[in-house]
Design a protein with these regions (language model features):
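Long, His/Glu/Asp-enriched segments that create or flank divalent metal/ion-associated functional microenvironments
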Residues: 1-172
Length: 172
């Protein structure tokens, strides 16, 4: 398939960092690849082939971003710096999502926290915060899912020792 990145204003969008982590997350080995394999797997029941699970889907996509460094896929330091910026964004999401839904953080406090801690536009920040308001814990699902995949990988690495193959783990 083809992966398109719709850039509304190329004069304002930073393509010098973060594009490779975006590709890993959204395309290969991220969502595009994951969903293609999932939908082609006739051994899965239909609710798993065509349904969604945010912790699995977003967890996998976030996990694949970490593979960029591990497998030497980032082509320059700016792309890796962009990946680290994306990781910071995920950490900030954890604070505001959990804060709004369990700690009485207001919409305005969440917007301020996000704008104080990362370089997003006000419009982008408001859109993010309203997304978290509408879909509680969706932002949390990225990190929780990725951590669970890493936990399973570490457990299997210890259990299997020299027999552990990363490609086999990713195939399961």
């Amino acid at each position: 398939g083809i992966f398109y990145v719709p850039i509304l204003d190329a004069t304002k969008f930073n393509t010098t960092s973060g594009m490779e982590s975006l590709f890993l997350h959204e395309a290969i080995p991220g969502h595009h690849y994951q969903v293609s394999l999932q939908q082609e797997n006739s051994q899965l029941p239909k609710f798993r082939r065509f349904g969604g699970n945010s912790a699995y889907a977003e967890g996998w996509a976030l996990y694949t971003e970490s593979l960029g460094k591990e497998l030497g896929l980032y082509t320059d330091p700016y792309q890796y710096m962009g990946a680290l910026g994306d990781e910071m964004h995920r950490a900030i999401r954890l604070v505001v999502d959990a804060g709004m839904h369990s700690k009485n953080m207001t919409r305005e406090e969440a917007i301020k926290f996000m704008m104080d801690n990362e370089p997003l536009s006000e419009e982008g920040t408001i859109a993010e915060i309203e997304r978290y308001m509408a879909i509680p814990a969706q932002a949390l699902s990225y990190k929780i899912g990725a951590l669970k995949i890493k936990e399973i990988r570490e457990r299997l690495t210890k259990q299997l020792g020299a027999k552990f193959k990363l490609s086999d783990f990713h195939d399961e």
